[in-house]
Amino acid sequence: MKRLLVAVLFLLVVPAHAAHGSSPASIDAALAQGKRENKPVLIDFQAVWCYSCYFMASHVLNGKEWDDLNRKVVFYEADADKPADKAWMTKLNVHFLPTYLAIGPDGEELGRILAERPRDAFYREVSGILSGDARLSKQKADAAKGSLAAVADVLDTYQRRYAGKEGMAWFDTLPPMVRNVSDKDKRVALAKQRLLLLQAKDAKDDKGIVDAATKVLAGNIGCERPYVLDDLVGATESQAADARRALLAPQKAAYDTYLATQVFTPSPACADQRSAVLTAADLYAALGDTAGETAVLRKGIDLSREKLHGDLKSDRNLADNLRVYLVRAKATDELDTLEKQLIAAWPDDYVYNYRHGRRLVEGGKAAEGLPYLEAAAKKAYGANRITVATYQVKALRALSRDADAKKVVAATTAAEGKAFPEQVKKLQESLTTAS
């Protein structure tokens, strides 16, 4: 799910799907129910702005398999913008949306799935997690017996938990004999590089990112290829054009094959088409291949339109992908039309009023954008309310309506300041910073 790390928390409304019967009121309540009923708890960390969540809601979290799963678990749909759920995201080190995280009746994490999946893959992975075989404690016990497959499993689990430092620290506790032979195992070697990539990203170490990402990309990483290549593209931005091309050019052939065989096919193996397309566009742009950049974006646009058959509401994931492709392609006229259609398609949602209003304000059209932001503000709350207010303030200040801007900040501070103090502080500072 490209560029969907939780640091970018924008929007939220009514959940796209729900479990059967009455749902627990909170994660704490879900855990208590799971313990009481001796059932695992499955938490879906999502948000209404999350395009990958749209995909899962429409294509995966429904039907017989979903009904069967709900009878086996206590399900809770966590809202990334609600203070209580956000606190749990921090506690559990959840950085990616959606994340599906299972916790056993005893409180031990059973495993987690990051990002969207094709239907069959999701239910297969969930089944494995609920069996208990993916518990970190079990994996470590198996690794202690000398299983290199278990060593790789442990490292992969730390990677899914965004715990690069902890994973490498655990690896260093293994007997020297195991560590010395581990690099001969392709899975272990790849898992180690993925943890080193996490550490380099945490440290904002571009050289470390380039080194680790290049090694990871040399492995069989399936649907994660766009995300890792995106890391590499980003880490080379500061390099001279020739040096950057030398680092990125070797990735083009493998990535073109990935697009042709796993994304642009009738039955894609990888569900996240958006990340695949945007990473391709960024790669081609970095290589100076303007024609390739334009072509892959237009292919994404045309395929989205073809599958939607003129009905945006038939698939929100596809509709939102179309919007983002048009943004990236700078197709302003098409985008203006589409965003208004999206607002009409989801009238109870502040998402598209916000996106359209923000884009107008950023484009210097404060007077045109403000009404859309005001419409969004009526439906926004939590972290989203602060984000919408930020652009309301920007628009009002551009229109020399500073008194109204102060009223927006005051109202937002009163409603959300206690739950989101850092974000509200930045909002307050926006009253005096250069607009």
Describe every region a protein language model picked out:
Residues 275, 317, 351, 385-387:
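Start-of-helix register in tetratricopeptide repeats
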Residues 140-143, 174-190, 215-226, 243-245, ...:
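Flexible helix-coil transition and linker loops at the boundaries of alpha-helical arrays
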Residues 161-165, 199-203, 239, 287, ...:
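Structural motif corresponding to the intra-repeat A-B loop/turn of tetratricopeptide repeats
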Residues 61, 94-135:
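Non-catalytic, surface beta->alpha helical segment in thiol-disulfide oxidoreductase systems
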